[in-house]
């Protein structure tokens, strides 16, 4: 087989067999058995074998929890071994790469029905229990939690079918992971052309006279060939097919080689692959996903064509979701782009950084908060009125400056609201837009700093209900407010650029949208977050992002 033909076959969502897997540090391969596993169909297996490869070693924190585990799930018809290739593992697991095997514990399972895990071709054939995607995810979870004794995942990532599993993981086990990255998928029911080509594959096998309800003595070759043709055309890239097969002779040879591969595939295994996706539909539960999620698709993916606009619509329902569409290029491979980290690796790096910050936001004891602040630094705040800059001096209020520095680093203030703007008095912000984050920090009080500066126009300080009660809320003095000095309000910085932006922040609601801090009237802001403020006070300006310069 030529290299170009191999690359084409490998781009198919279920054809992921690398020519020469690499070996990584502490690489092991084994089986784990789940006993008396019950499927959604009601069928049971006394012993469900889950084959897996692991790379690296688990690291445990002071509480004994695994902190560096990653699961990567393969596509339809694939296996975990596919991820050991130079093109995938070489880009991600080597020294200095985002999932460096020296610092991560990487779990590569063979899914139910696939690879060396339990599957119809082991002997049960058509009597093998009918599994669906949720069954497969429950088996993955059992392997991770019960088999490998991992109680938390740093990252859940999958390609194609594995990407669809990633959405399900986020809904079934929302507190089990720090980040999710589905590659080449959509979080909705499989319908339209996607379902049609799957139905063609299923019917091609079932309608072959040799199939005999799965008890064939001779492989149903014509059905398998027709199924493979449909699959290949959907999962390949028109650009790459033309580049690697520029003559009719090469194109015909590629089809002939594809035919030979098709007849070596077990028909029952293949049928089960595609029937498992029939009831897939995570769309009703997208709001349950808690961890940051980056959904990555490519513009030349015929299985998940971007013109349908599905992910643009659905990602808005994922609390910390982001959709990335990779443009067609010489590096993309249609649906198979999911297995080319060289194209999308930079987004994995961004996701891991964001999820680190997100984990810190939910845990005030996280090591993230130990970072000391510089003696002086500048923070740029991007708002719906424009940008302005705060210059912070640590010696003005050391504790307050340090917390502000780290809150900005963590993204605490990003996508929040200026909820209390009282003209000719103050502009206040600092309640997180995510109620889960806001609740964590609501009572994380700081000891007072001595007030070394006056509350003059342009200075910034923490709002508080009394002594030693500073948390995250910040106000900007819109005029000289010297009456605040004897009450212990200690400025830690001042606005040095963009004062006209501060003056334009919407103040029409005054105290009504977020005042009453001392009277305990801010509960709706903490409990409802941005959703409450946007519904009740839609004209409030937004703090889009805060960045240490």
Report each predicted region and the residues it spans:
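Short beta-strand/loop motif that positions the catalytic acidic residue
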Residues: 289, 295-297
């Amino acid at each position: 087989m030529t290299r170009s033909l191999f690359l084409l076959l490998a781009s198919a969502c279920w054809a992921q067999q690398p020519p020469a897997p690499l070996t990584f540090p502490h690489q092991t391969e084994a089986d784990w058995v789940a006993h008396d596993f019950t499927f959604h169909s009601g069928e049971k297996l006394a012993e469900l074998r889950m084959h897996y490869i692991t790379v690296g070693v688990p690291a445990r924190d002071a509480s004994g929890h695994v902190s560096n585990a990653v699961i990567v799930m393969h596509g339809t018809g694939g296996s975990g071994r596919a991820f050991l290739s130079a093109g995938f593992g070489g880009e991600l697991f080597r020294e200095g790469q985002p999932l460096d095997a020296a610092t991560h514990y990487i779990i590569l399972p063979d899914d139910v029905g696939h690879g060396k895990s339990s599957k119809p071709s082991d002997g049960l054939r058509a009597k093998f229990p009918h599994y669906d995607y949720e069954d497969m995810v429950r088996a993955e979870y059992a392997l991770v939690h019960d088999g490998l004794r991992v109680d938390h995942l740093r990252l859940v990532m999958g390609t194609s079918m594995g990407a669809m599993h990633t959405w399900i993981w986020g809904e079934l086990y929302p507190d089990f992971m720090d980040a999710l990255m589905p590659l080449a998928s959509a979080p909705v029911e499989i319908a339209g052309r996607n379902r049609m080509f799957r139905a063609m594959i299923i019917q091609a096998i079932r309608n072959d006279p040799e199939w005999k309800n799965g008890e064939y003595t001779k492989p149903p070759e014509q059905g398998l060939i027709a199924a493979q043709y449909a699959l290949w055309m959907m999962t390949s890239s028109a650009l790459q097919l033309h580049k690697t097969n520029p003559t009719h002779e090469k194109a015909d040879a590629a089809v002939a080689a594809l035919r030979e591969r098709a007849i070596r595939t077990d028909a029952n295994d293949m049928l089960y692959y595609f029937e498992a996706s029939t009831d897939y539909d995570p769309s009703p539960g997208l709001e349950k996903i808690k961890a940051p999620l980056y959904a990555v698709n490519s513009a030349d993916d015929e299985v998940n064509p971007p013109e349908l606009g599905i992910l643009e619509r659905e990602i808005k329902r994922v609390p910390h979701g982001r959709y990335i569409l990779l443009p067609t290029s010489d590096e993309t491979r249609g649906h198979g782009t999911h297995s080319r980290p060289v194209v999308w690796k930079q987004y994995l790096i961004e996701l891991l950084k964001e999820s680190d910050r997100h984990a810190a936001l939910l845990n005030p004891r996280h090591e993230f908060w130990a970072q000391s602040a510089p003696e002086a630094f500048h923070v740029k705040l991007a708002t719906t009125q424009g940008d302005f800059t705060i210059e912070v001096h640590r010696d003005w209020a050391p504790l307050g400056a340090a917390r502000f520095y780290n809150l900005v680093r963590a993204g605490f203030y990003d996508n929040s609201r200026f909820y209390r703007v009282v003209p000719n008095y103050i502009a206040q912000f600092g309640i997180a837009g995510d109620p889960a984050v806001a609740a964590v920090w609501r009572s994380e009080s700081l000891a007072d700093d001595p007030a070394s500066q006056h509350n003059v126009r342009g200075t910034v300080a923490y709002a508080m209900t009394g002594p030693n009660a500073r948390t995250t809320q910040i106000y900007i003095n819109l005029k000289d407010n010297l009456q605040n000095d004897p009450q212990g309000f200690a400025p830690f910085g001042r606005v040095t650029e963009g004062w006209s932006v501060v003056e334009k922040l919407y103040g029409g609601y005054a105290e009504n949208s977020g005042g009453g801090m001392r009277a305990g009237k801010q509960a709706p802001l903490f409990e409802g977050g941005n959703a409450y403020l946007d519904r009740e006070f839609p004209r409030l300006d937004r703090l889009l992002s805060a960045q240490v310069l």
